[in-house]
């Protein structure tokens, strides 16, 4: 398995669940702030159009693919990797570690509805998890510095972001140097709390996969010329 890949011109790490967890553990031991993000086809396509999103994705310490279609596009979706992605193996294993280690979690999202759903899910599935704070960007007036102050006052171990892209990437890019935490985990909007795809969303997912395949093919043709 290739550990560093290029998808539609974007350089990303391609490690399995246990390799990613080992990388995180090593950074924790060295007291190094670690950035993690779940990446799907929509995120890749956004990065094609937005240089700031691409910059953030390429700077991540750990990339977790949340759709097998990303690896399908470059022929790297093995049976094992596909199973990991479909079972959300990284998310579940990581959250179990967070819960059992007693790490504190700060949840940041765009709206109160998403925050409430995620909080309830974590309480149901990881009952011993310590949520030290939460915030919805839609409820904040003016600059985001109040959020940064709140985060740094609480000094959580994990910042769990359920912000949608590209808001998530732009927030991380702007405020990463200011954050007092051990780990930033950008899950993205709608990926927690058992959210199901609507028929319309399933159609869009197939469309994005076809578009991503086109970008990959164009990249190969450019390399050959």
Task: Locate predicted features.
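N-terminal nucleotide/polyanion-binding subdomain common to many enzyme families
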Residues: 1-83
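A short, gly/pro- and small-residue-rich
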Residues: 53-59, 169-191
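Structural motif
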Residues: 62, 104, 157-158
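Conserved beta-alpha
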Residues: 71-144, 150, 154, 225
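Proline-aspartate-enriched helix->loop->beta-strand connector
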Residues: 151-165, 181
């Amino acid at each position: 398995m290739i550990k560093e890949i290029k998808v539609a011109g974007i350089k990303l790490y391609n490690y399995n669940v246990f390799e990613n967890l080992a990388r995180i553990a090593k950074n924790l031991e060295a007291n190094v702030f670690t950035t993690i993000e779940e990446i799907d086809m929509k995120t890749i396509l956004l990065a094609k159009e937005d240089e700031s999103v691409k910059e953030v994705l390429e700077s991540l310490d750990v990339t977790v693919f949340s759709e097998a279609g990303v690896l399908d596009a470059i022929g790297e979706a093995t049976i094992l990797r596909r199973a990991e992605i479909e079972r959300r193996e990284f998310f579940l294993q990581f959250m179990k570690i967070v819960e059992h280690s007693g790490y504190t979690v700060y949840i940041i999202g765009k709206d109160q509805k998403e925050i409430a759903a995620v909080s309830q899910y974590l309480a149901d599935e990881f009952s011993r998890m310590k949520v030290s704070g939460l915030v919805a960007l839609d409820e904040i007036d003016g600059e985001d510095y109040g959020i940064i102050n709140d985060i740094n006052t609480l000094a959580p171990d994990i910042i769990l972001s359920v912000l949608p892209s590209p808001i998530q990437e732009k927030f991380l890019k702007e405020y990463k140097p200011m954050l007092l935490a051990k780990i930033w985990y950008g899950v993205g909007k709608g990926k927690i709390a058992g959210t199901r795809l609507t028929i319309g969303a399933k159609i869009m997912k197939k469309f994005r996969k076809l578009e991503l395949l086109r970008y990959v093919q164009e990249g190969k043709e450019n390399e050959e010329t």
